[in-house]
Amino acid sequence: VTADAPAGRDARDVARRLDEVADALRSHNIEAIVVGDGEEARAIVLGLIPEGAEVHSGKSKTLEDTGLYTELVESGRYEALRPRMAAMDRATQGREIRKLSAAPDFMLGSVAAITADGTLV
């Protein structure tokens, strides 16, 4: 969750609300980290994924906008599964595709929305 907001009182209100939503997520056993912007989020996520890890990602505007998807696919530091699976023949390699997508080391994606009570939409 990023805290991009106008300065002043509005920024404090946004920060307070983000902290409340993060607490609600935690109450559902979902780890939540509030960050200042997409670059900070990108750095944190990349810091959590060790080099060489298998990483699968869903289609995500957030991953694209933060540069995470490009980093995962093009840096050579990770084994990006999405492009690998896209290049496979579903008719002859369907079982292997399912196995790869079922248990990657890391799965990244995004949600459409998060409600104030910590529900993912």
Segments the model singles out, each with a brief description of its role:
Residues 1-121:
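The feature marks the mature, well-folded catalytic cores of soluble enzymes
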